């Protein structure tokens, strides 16, 4: 009888462990969160989705290359993914000038991504000029946060 109880306990333990095991099937299909250039999809879409620009500038500086490369890798690896690049400016300048500058910023990011092989059909652009400030204020601290392009998925 003692041997029977031990066998029953071992079988019960094995069954309990089997019930606690989990499948390796996640969104990436490999048991780990999928990353692109070291960034998770959530990080790319929510935390690292903004490129900032200097005053009256629309060139992409080196500090954004790694992030944009990660966005390009994500877009290239994800057939259904599309992004709208939103160009923005600070409040200085005429509304017409700022719309044009915001568009140049959006186009610069789009051009960078296209240069990394992203299909142009996955890339849209829009300029909001000064109409959608990230930070309200009339000083350089606010202006620097408003001169941006946002990748909106």
Swiss-Prot record:
Sites of S-diacylglycerol cysteine lipidation: 20
Residues carrying lipid (N-palmitoyl cysteine): 20
PROSITE patterns registered for this protein in UniProt: OMPA_1, OMPA_2, PROKAR_LIPOPROTEIN
Subcellular localization, as worded in the UniProt entry: Cell outer membrane
InterPro entries (alphabetical): Bact_OuterMem_StrucFunc, OMP_bac, OmpA-like, OMPA-like_CS, OmpA-like_sf, Pal, Pal_lipo_C
Superkingdom to which the source organism belongs: Bacteria
Subunit structure: The Tol-Pal system is composed of five core proteins: the inner membrane proteins TolA, TolQ and TolR, the periplasmic protein TolB and the outer membrane protein Pal. They form a network linking the inner and outer membranes and the peptidoglycan layer.
Protein name: Peptidoglycan-associated lipoprotein
Organism, scientific name: Haemophilus influenzae (strain ATCC 51907 / DSM 11121 / KW20 / Rd)
């Amino acid at each position: 009888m003692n041997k029977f109880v031990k066998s029953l306990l071992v079988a019960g333990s094995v069954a309990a462990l089997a019930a606690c095991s989990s499948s390796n099937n996640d969104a990436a299909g490999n048991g780990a969160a999928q990353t692109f250039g070291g960034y998770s999809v959530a990080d790319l879409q929510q935390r690292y989705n903004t490129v900032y620009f200097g005053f009256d500038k629309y060139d992409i500086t080196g500090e954004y290359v790694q992030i944009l490369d990660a966005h390009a890798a994500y877009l290239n690896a994800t057939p259904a993914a599309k992004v709208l690049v939103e160009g923005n400016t600070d409040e200085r300048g005429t509304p017409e000038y700022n719309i044009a500058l915001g568009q140049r910023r959006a186009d610069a990011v789009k051009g960078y991504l296209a240069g990394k092989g992203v299909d142009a059909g996955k890339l849209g652009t829009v300029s909001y000029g000064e109409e959608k400030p990230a930070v309200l204020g009339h000083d350089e601290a606010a202006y620097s946060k408003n001169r941006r392009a946002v990748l909106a998925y």
